[in-house]
């Protein structure tokens, strides 16, 4: 059953899990896309203005490198957000798999903070988010496994 929910034989637009996990997934889509655009569009990519990485103390080349990496990170987040959005509008049976991916991402973000810490002037919002989103992802993954009424679009063939 675990595998059947994560990797259904037929991918459809039917969602049979708890509605809370679905609506929370919608909120995560919005957060992911907005966050990605911030990293891509802010002049510093959010590296100093949000994450408080002291790039103003770096050489011009190092500062440009950090900003470029933040842009690429934003681009990867945008791609993830678009995949989440496609799942939400067309392939809802994959929502449990998306919650698994979401949870794994935040587990590795947390581990990276211990393994390869980044110098910041303050606690970055993402660092706090790791401690919130890991339990949230686990709870939503669990709820997405709970059978409830079928939710689908009229186009779900």
Where are these regions (language model features)?
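Cytosolic juxtamembrane helix and N-cap/initiation of the first transmembrane helix
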Residues: 2-35
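Hydrophobic transmembrane helix segments
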Residues: 31-59
